[in-house]
Amino acid sequence: AIDTAQFLECPAIQISTGFGYFDMPREEAWKFCRESVGTLAAYAERKGVTLLLEELKVTTTNVLITSKDLAKMIAEIDSPAVVGMVDMDQMTYAGETIDDYFANLGDKLQHIHFNDRGHTVPGDADFPMKEYYDQIKAHGYEGTCSFEICDRRYYIDPDKAIDDTVAWMRANTHE
């Protein structure tokens, strides 16, 4: 993926941690993750590609779950090629806020998955998406943002999901 990103002149790719065995200490999975992402980071640095490290839900992983986890892992790897991102679904599931991500990651927060609960179109579920948007803007965020819309309800007509996302943005933002 790093080589493909370089070839396509894509500045960044998203990565996540995977998970450790749930019957082993979390520290073991953490160590494996740090070593693996560190190896990828060294290669990504040489290729001029940034790695956007994403947290996952506790139901998916036992490694990176919160913004504090992300900040700690990024600090331990200590590579300019590794930065953090936030997914609204994972953030809310972990009981965190946008302010937590900005406080813990600072300028290392460089990508946002702006989606409603269950990776749905903003406004299709129950997250306070307008509030989230306003908080992001209040922090002066100028990084990248994407809509990770992957709920099965959109499989039949993905174009409608895009249209609904654009409509939500027009109705709720100045973008």
Tell me what each language-model feature is.
Residues 1-83, 93:
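Active-site acidic/histidine proton-transfer and metal-coordination neighborhood
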Residues 9, 64-86, 91-175:
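Histidine-acidic metal/acid-base catalytic patches
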